[in-house]
């Protein structure tokens, strides 16, 4: 099904074209990072991948939180604690990224933890074809220990970055594509900052 050619869809088609130029076949993982609006952007990006005929799956790092007690070790809602302790990257790799990359009949999970109820979710395993796309959204996906996991990354620059993340990960410098999504109807690509 062809999506209507709105400014947003046209911008997303361009991004899909760029990603496919980088990784035309095989298992492809695209990260959508940013402080806000990542879920809606990633949902729409996944739809455009589907429109192009790709077997596309969606996940959010928000479904890989750590238990509340572990997230608040440095105090409730501290910026450092939020950056360092919010997400369970080991589980993200073990049940989603690594099995997705294995291809074949290996199953993967797109969620592992329910933050609102503070409990693990029941395992729901998915499989995909050899040329599948996984679009994952959320904060801090371009941190140093994750950035090599993605075939491509989109950084939404419509929200101020958290200082510790910006300082440590420099997401604007490593993202494949920068997008200002402050007007969701008409997202605009942003030029990469000059190197210092």
Language model features: what each stretch is:
Residues 76-83, 145-170, 190-194:
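A glycine- and Lys/Arg-enriched "phosphate-lid" helix/loop adjacent to the NTP-binding pocket
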Residues 3-22, 148, 166-196:
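NTP-dependent small-molecule kinase module
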Residues 57-60, 65-117, 133:
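Conserved nucleotide-sensing/catalytic segment adjacent to the nucleotide-binding pocket
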Residues 31-47:
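Glycine-rich phosphate-binding P-loop
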Residues 56-58, 153-155, 176-178:
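Conserved beta-strand scaffold positions in the cores of enzyme catalytic domains, especially
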Residues 117-159:
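ATP-dependent NMP and nucleoside kinases share a basic, alpha-helical "lid"
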Residues 47-57:
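Post-Walker A helix-loop "phosphate-sensing" segment adjacent to the P-loop in P-loop NTPases
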Residues 24-30, 131:
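Pre-Walker A (Motif I) flank of P-loop NTPase domains
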């Amino acid at each position: 099904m062809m999506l209507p050619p709105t400014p947003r869809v046209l911008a997303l088609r361009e991004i899909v074209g760029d990603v496919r130029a980088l990784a035309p076949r095989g298992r492809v993982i695209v990260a959508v990072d940013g402080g806000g609006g990542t879920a809606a952007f990633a949902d729409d990006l996944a739809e455009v991948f589907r429109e192009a005929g790709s077997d596309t799956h969606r996940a959010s790092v928000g479904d890989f939180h750590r238990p509340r007690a572990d997230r608040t070790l440095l105090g409730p809602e501290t910026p450092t604690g939020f950056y360092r302790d919010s997400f369970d990257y080991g589980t993200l790799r073990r049940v989603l990224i690594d099995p997705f990359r294995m291809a074949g009949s290996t199953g993967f999970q797109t969620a592992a933890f329910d933050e609102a109820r503070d409990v693990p979710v029941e395992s729901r395993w998915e499989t995909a074809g050899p040329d599948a796309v996984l679009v994952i959204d959320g904060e801090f996906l371009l941190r140093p220990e994750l950035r090599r996991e993605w075939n491509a990354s989109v950084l939404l620059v419509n929200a101020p970055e958290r200082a510790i993340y910006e300082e440590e990960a420099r997401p604007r410098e490593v993202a494949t594509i920068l997008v200002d999504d402050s007007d969701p109807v008409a997202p605009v690509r942003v030029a990469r900052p000059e190197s210092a």
